[in-house]
Amino acid sequence: MSEQHNQPGFTDQSLIRNFCIIAHIDHGKSTVADRILQLSGIVPEREMRDRFLDRMDIEQERGITIKSQAVRVPWSYDGQEYTLGMIDTPGHVDFTYEVSRALAACEGAVLLVDATQGIEAQTLSNLYMAIDHDLTIIPVLNKIDLPSAEPDKHAEEIASLIGCEPSDVLRVSGKTGEGVRELLDRIVVDVPAPTGDPDADARALIFDSVYDSYRGIVTYIRMVDGELRSREKLHMMGVGTTYDPIEIGVISPDMMPTRALGAGEVGYVITGAKDVSQSKVGDTITSTAHPATEPLPGYRDPQPMVYAGLFPIDNAQFPELREALDKLKLNDAALIYEPETSVALGFGFRCGFLGLLHMEIVSERLSREFGLDLISTAPNVPYEVTAEDGTVHRVTNPSEFPDGKIKRIVEPMVAADIITPKEFIGAVMDLCQEHRGTMSTMEYISTDRVEMHYRIPLAEIVFDFFDQLKSRTKGYASLDYHDDGEEAADLVKVDILIQGEKIDAFSAIVHRDKAYSYGVMMTKKLRELIPRQQFEIPIQAAIGSRIIARENIRALRKDVLAKCYGGDITRKRKLLEKQKAGKKRMKMLGHVEVPQEAFVAALSTGEGGNDRDTKDKIRAAQKSEG
């Protein structure tokens, strides 16, 4: 076969194999991807670095994959040159939506399992997703070079899970490269070729997009039918816009322009559009010369699990925050946001996230990539509140909570799957009960590991549940959760009052049993953070009109007796009474300004906050105030 036949746009569909690598966090997906890039020779030895496909600084620092990356890899088998389309996916539960989009662009999935850890919660979750997409599963044990690896034991676990023989489970080492060649051969043999029609009208599915400040929107596509040529006009079927493409190409592993993309291939299109609303993940691209009549089925829009407010420390940065969120939305289809105003914090956005890690990554990317200093409010989940007059309110922010009598509050629930060694069953049960969880079933997946299924309110999981689960099980337990309907609960809104005024940024919706502890925690924290004034300041926590906790910030006092050396007690008493009357009048007229740094510190180290940059933010707040 001539060299021409393996060029992008001319590759015979029967020689294409599209696959993704799925696994639990830290099971070695990115390392195996590195070895595949090295073996295929598309990355020269001197340019190779660890976690080659993790392009973001945050990914490199944290050692986690956040964005899926699609790469075209050549591979020879039995004297025939094949083209492999490889997608490296994230492993964390917050980025499941990234994984589901990657699965829709493939025909096969490499299920990677750490030979020292075995099957974990995300392994199962990703496996079930791959089965839902009808993908061919290739089971692989990674890290077999480690002394603590137990490949035989875990090969049997995997075999019983997916219904194959233990001998069918491949054994590789991402570190040494052992077994990777056999894995690539197995992909060529087992993964089916794409089934699109190369002669039909062109249809390509957008599965991701990024913003390039020089060239505009870069759209990642999977060709399903027909072909797209670089000189033809393109039509976005969902948005209804038409473009002359600046460039069409493949990623191998850097962008490589080509003349065309054919059926079954994965590549990119640069349209030159700068308007971020013009590229929607899940849309279908077709050619205006031979337009398709039916668009491809897109993706189900992800539902945010957690809401939080993002406010610029300097209010003048509000337009920049809007622009930054628009650009980030291109690259992160799961992020949703709308403008909001807070009495205390000014203008900002109410953002919806898939989880706490997702929230932390978004705030960090906004501050790094766009140079913004932000305050994020405590995370909330969406509630449905029915007032006594029958009106229903959807509440994503405590300030939207209706006043007056409440008939019913419904909160979102999740089905949590926890896998843990059997010696920690008691500790996990205690933790779930403390967080209002109810157990549904429990089964042993091997002689020493248990899978427990719980139904838990989402509000209990989004704060510190995962950290506590890890600490109580010495890091061995793993957690996966998904939406499981709603349930009525006894919830209340706790307001924080300073000098009798409600401060909306500190309000929270909590379970009645935890209302007192939240009130005590916030009042104590604010007492330390708010500077003393010339008069006494009461800090109160209230449910409706009932005060449940109180702290006082004592008044600063000038020593009015300093000039009295001895003398009559009535003279001293007169001066003290005069001071007292002045303080009383000041207390009635005085207004307490809560400094910006107090907001930053109280919200960053609140229950949900795990913000490591609190001190930097406080400094930035002080600068912007000064």
Swiss-Prot record:
Annotated residues for binding of GTP: 26-31, 142-145
Family annotation (CDD domains): EF4_II, EF4_III, LepA, lepA_C
Pfam assignment, any one: LepA_C
UniProt key word Protein biosynthesis: yes
Record membrane topology: Peripheral membrane protein
Species whose genome carries this gene: Bifidobacterium animalis subsp. lactis (strain AD011)
Reactions it catalyzes: GTP + H2O = GDP + phosphate + H(+)
Enzyme nomenclature, EC number: 3.6.5.n1
Keywords: Cell membrane, GTP-binding, Hydrolase, Membrane, Nucleotide-binding, Protein biosynthesis
PROSITE patterns: G_TR_1 (PS00301), G_TR_2 (PS51722)
Localisation: Cell membrane
Segments for region (Disordered): 603-626
Gene transcribed to yield this protein: lepA
Protein name: Elongation factor 4
Main location: membrane
